UniProtKB/Swiss-Prot annotation:
PTM characteristics: Phosphorylated by protein kinase C and calcium-calmodulin-dependent protein kinase. These phosphorylation events are modulated by neurotransmitters or hormones.
Other observations noted: Increases PLD1 and PLD2 levels, possibly by stabilizing the protein.
Microtubule-binding as annotated region, ranges: 98-107, 122-129
Purpose: Blocks Ras-mediated inhibition of integrin activation and modulates the ERK MAP kinase cascade. Inhibits RPS6KA3 activities by retaining it in the cytoplasm. Inhibits both TNFRSF6- and TNFRSF1A-mediated CASP8 activity and apoptosis. Regulates glucose transport by controlling both the content of SLC2A1 glucose transporters on the plasma membrane and the insulin-dependent trafficking of SLC2A4 from the cell interior to the surface.
Protein name: Astrocytic phosphoprotein PEA-15
PANTHER family: ASTROCYTIC PHOSPHOPROTEIN PEA-15, DED DOMAIN-CONTAINING PROTEIN
Residues annotated with Phosphoserine modification: 61, 90, 104, 116
Chief place of localization: cytoplasm
Length: 130
């Protein structure tokens, strides 16, 4: 799948050495320290994740989570765009698939919604100055 390779290349091009250290730190529980030292490029990081079943063309949830906690919305947006455009999976559908970032999210699926007009708390106007 050429789109997947393009996605990884685009992500790699947007990851600096400083970013890479932050990303490795965010997933330090999954990367042994001796391996972490060997990972010196974004592509090496992606290769490590692929070889340890944390990443593949149909499952990007791990890096979505890492980009989210690393505060990299630009990288996360690229992954979400790939997921919706290439894999044809939207945010709503994601709750019902294996791509769910947080497994416990399924039980809250029906709770996550906009409040109805009756549920919105109305605030009183501010007091008038004397």
């Amino acid at each position: 799948m050429a789109e997947y390779g393009t996605l990884l290349q685009d992500l790699t091009n947007n990851i600096t050495l400083e970013d890479l250290e932050q990303l490795k730190s965010a997933c330090k529980e999954d990367i042994p320290s001796e391996k972490s030292e060997e990972i010196t490029t974004g592509s090496a990081w992606f290769s490590f994740l692929e070889s340890h079943n944390k990443l593949d063309k149909d499952n990007l949830s791990y890096i979505e989570h890492i980009f989210e906690i690393s505060r990299r919305p630009d990288l996360l947006t690229m992954v979400v765009d790939y997921r919706t455009r290439v894999l044809k999976i939207s945010e709503e559908e994601e709750l019902d698939t294996k791509l769910t970032r947080i497994p416990s999210a399924k039980k809250y699926k029906d709770i996550i919604r906009q409040p109805s007009e009756e549920e919105i708390i109305k605030l009183a106007p501010p007091p008038k100055k004397a």
